[in-house]
Amino acid sequence: MAKTLLPGLRLLRRLGVGSLGGGFRVLLFHDIPKEHFRFFERLLEHILAVRGVITPDQAQALLSGQVPVGCQGKIPMLLTFDDGFQSQARVAEKILDKYGVKAIFFICPGLIDIPPEGQREAIAKYIFDGKHGEDLPGNLRLLSWSEAESLLASGHTIGSHTSFHRRLTGLGPEELQGEVLGSGELLEKRLGISVHWFAYPFGNIESIDPSSYELIRSHYEFSCSGIRGLNSNQTHPLALLRDCMDPMSPLDYQEFVLLGGLDFFYRRRARRLHVMAKNADGIH
C-alpha cells in the first residue's frame, strides 16, 4: 500500500493540500483496545507536530470564519470518539490528558443504562448492526456514567449518538424522537450539562434523512456525519464531515487521509448532506 500511495502523497504535498488555513478536519475513532494505545499515541504525536489539534470551541470559531491563535496557515484536527466504549475513557486518561488534548465523546445513554450482563448483546445488535455477542472481542464494554463524568471533569465534551444507536432512516416519529431528542435529554439530566453536539449512527448518507434533520436542528447546534471531507466556514454546522481513522493503518495511508486524499470520492455525498441541513433550516 505504501508504494501505491507515494505518488498521491507527493502530489498532495506539492499542491500544498492540507496546509491552507481556515479549515479543519474532524477525525473519528471507535473502540481502541489497550494493545493499540501505542499506535494511537504515535498518530496523535504526528498530528500535534504537523497540524495541531483544536478544541470544540475552536472548531466553532473556525465555522464562523474566525481563525483561532495557532491555527494560521494549517488545517488542524478535532478529535471525536463514537459509541461510548470503555476503552475510550482509558485513551482519554492515559493519552489525551497527557498531551492536553480535548475531544468530543459521542455516547448512547440508553445503551449505558442496560445492565452489564446484557450489554454485549446490545452492542452487537445496535452498534454492530445485528451481530451476536459471541462474535465480539471479549473485552468490549461501554463506559459507565461515572466514567462519562470523569471525561467532563477533564475538560472533554459529551455529545449524543442517539439513545440506542439505531439507524434513523425508517424509524417512526415516536421512535425518532426517542433516539434524537430523548438521548440529549437523558444526557443532560444524568450529567447536568447542556448537550450541543450530535453524531448520527453509522454516519453514511443513507442513514440520515430530512425528518431526522428536523429533530436534530430543534435540539442541537452541531451534527457530525461519517462522510469524509474538509470543514470550513462554508460548512453547515449540522453537516460536519469526519474522517474515520484506524490507529493500526499504515502511516502513509493515515497521512493520505489527513491530506484529504479521499475527499474527492465523497464530494457528492457531502453536497447532499449540506443541502439536507440547509433545507432543515428553511434555506434553499
Identify what each model region corresponds to.
Residues 94, 149, 213-214:
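Alpha-helical segments flanking ligand/cofactor-binding loops in enzyme cores
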Residues 27, 74-77, 97-206, 237-240:
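Metal-dependent polysaccharide deacetylase catalytic core of the NodB/CE4 family, i.e.
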Residues 42-50, 95-99, 154:
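A short, Lys/Arg-enriched amphipathic alpha-helix followed by its capping loop at the start of a domain
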Residues 1-80, 86-90, 170-284:
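C-terminal active-site subregion of NodB/CE4 polysaccharide deacetylases
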Residues 85-86, 164:
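Short active-site segment of divalent metal-dependent hydrolases/proteases
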